Amino acid sequence: MTRGPSATGAVSGETPPPAHSDDASGADITRLVTQFLSVRKHFAARAARHDRTGIFAPETVRELADAGFLRVPVRLQAGGYGASLSVAQNIVGLLAQSDPVAALLLVNHYMVHASIAARDNWPEPLARRLEEQAVSRPGLINALLAEPDLGSASQGGSPGTVATATGDGWRLNGRKAYVTGIPGLSELVVRARTDEPEPRVGLFVVSAGADGVTTVPNWDHIGMRASASHEVILRDVIVPYEDTTTLFHGDAKAASGSVLMHWNCGLLGALYDGVVRSALAWTIDFLRTRIPSNLGKPLATLPFMQDAAGRVSLTLATNNLLLRAYASDVLTGNAVTISSDAAVIKTEVVDKAADLTMQLLAIAGNAGLSARNTLERCHRDALCGRIHAPHAELVRRRAGQTVLLTPPL
């Protein structure tokens, strides 16, 4: 795999990702990102406005679709860019430096389409139809995995959303939690179980505008405020039999597919790395321009400020190495290391993003907490990294079980 610049670009967000040898459309990807760089300030300004109001920005979805960003993971032969996880990380990380909510929308969209592109439990006719839609009339898609009662699927357990066989297809009933971007979604990929004597679990594709789909507008978190990650109620929603992935007995985790979960981890890492890069960029500018009257020179000249900024910068360099190694393993299908690398990315990149923004707040002082400035919003958004599944306690416990309970060779 060709190595290039940082997985999320420079701290300033000014370096577009290079073409990669595993992407036949590398030049097209570079043009796409260069186009975004010319309007990134527009995205950043809108993100700040909608963070204050907490209102979803549908124009963001339209602009991403019109520019071609929704086709990034779609196969080349289907009219997409055929991008690898590495390139998708570049795009998500770069976008996160301007608009973390828009980046989160792409995380969910990309992980589903990567799974479709790999035909990971997806029957060919359904996969082909969704790819054609992504190119001819692009719209956002998201996987509805979490539930208010069950919580995250990563903890195990059968979903409470039930699919009942009828003469017209499956009839879905249930409630899903944290459906990011629901006002802007075109398709919902719903994790559900059948009501058969021996239940099967799989993903059911539902149009977001289908009869029986209702949104409960209850998202009120302090971070990712404009993501509209509301709950969704499904009441007697009809799904044609051909609009489901492979249905699995017993092992419900297999129903989501490994590709979807692998991309989810790698892209979330890029997103929260991008949030920290944005926070550091603001802090650097502040320290360079802030000259206290009793000091007579910029705060950036103080050794302890340099130490603090350097600590965050070095951690971001480590993030880059981790994200690149993980994307390489996913590309080559290195199953031995993917699982352990995913645990490291969740705990060290995603979960610790808020630790890094807190360190920056500590040196920025009152200015860092002002709603007029970027840093406090970056910190609130970074806190959301910890709520993504799997949660840190589960990751650490699994790691502990591996080292303590696995017999030595």
Residue ranges and their predicted role:
Residues 178-215:
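A short core secondary-structure module
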Residues 35-38, 275, 282, 311, ...:
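Charged, amphipathic alpha-helical oligomerization/scaffolding segments
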Residues 221-315:
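Glycine-rich beta->alpha junctions and the first turn(s) of the following alpha-helix
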Residues 58-66, 71-175, 180:
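Glycine-rich flavin
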Residues 177-182, 265-268, 385-388:
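Glycine-rich phosphate/pyrophosphate-binding beta-alpha loops
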Residues 1-107:
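Amphipathic, small/basic residue-rich leader segments at the start of a protein or domain
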Residues 44, 48-52, 317-348, 361-369:
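C-terminal helix-coil-helix/basic helical segment that borders enzyme active sites and/or dimer interfaces
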Residues 3, 366-409:
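Glycine-rich phosphate/cofactor-binding loops in nucleotide/flavin-utilizing enzymes
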